[in-house]
């Protein structure tokens, strides 16, 4: 839980801001010069969160891994599910890494150069929380397709009905 003391940090370099944000939540994290990796809890699984800062482009790439590895024989149907899911998203997208079969959510944020590459706490919170929320929202779709015997369309319909019923 973030405290009023945590909100005193108004802006910092993107990796510094994410490091402070993760620390405030008590999440395990590993930091490198232009990269930070953290583990965040979710209701379905824990998420590995990776952020990579490309200073010369002023771009922060953010990845969330929902701990789903797709077997070769299920990839075609999962690609279809990813396409249907991505149609529902305004920001970011899901993809499947062909070399490893790992599913992930990817988003990139351009950090305004006028602020000398600084990221606000609000921007960090929005980036992290929106990635986790989308992973949580669509995790059941991928599970239904992979292990529940549903078609991608059936899985999406079932998952969206289930989430609409939650309070």
Give a label for each model feature.
Residues 108-142:
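Long, amphipathic alpha-helical coupling/dimerization segments that relay conformational signals between
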Residues 20, 24-62, 67:
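Ser/Thr-rich, low-complexity intrinsically disordered terminal regions
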Residues 5-6, 63-71, 117-120, 124:
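Short histidine-centered catalytic/ligand-binding loop motif
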Residues 65-104:
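Short, internal acidic amphipathic alpha-helical interface segments
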Residues 143-167:
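Short, highly charged C-terminal tails/helix-capping segments
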Residues 1-17, 65-68:
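Terminal, regulation- and interaction-focused segments at domain boundaries
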């Amino acid at each position: 839980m973030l405290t009023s003391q945590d909100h005193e940090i108004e802006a910092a370099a993107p990796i510094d801001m994410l490091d402070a944000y993760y620390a405030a939540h008590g999440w395990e994290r590993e930091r490198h010069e232009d990269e930070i990796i953290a583990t965040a809890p979710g209701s379905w699984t824990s998420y590995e969160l990776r952020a990579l800062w490309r200073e010369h482009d002023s771009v922060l790439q953010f990845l969330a891994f929902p701990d789903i590895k797709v077997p070769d024989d299920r990839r075609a149907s999962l690609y279809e599910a990813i396409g249907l899911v991505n149609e529902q998203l305004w920001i970011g997208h899901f993809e499947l890494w062909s070399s490893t079969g790992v599913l992930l959510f990817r988003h990139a944020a351009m950090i305004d150069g006028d602020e000398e590459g600084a990221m606000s706490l609000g921007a960090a919170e929005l980036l992290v929380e929106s990635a986790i929320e989308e992973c949580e929202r669509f995790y059941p779709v991928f599970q239904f397709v992979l292990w529940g015997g549903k078609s991608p369309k059936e899985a999406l319909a079932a998952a969206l009905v289930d989430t609409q019923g939650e309070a």
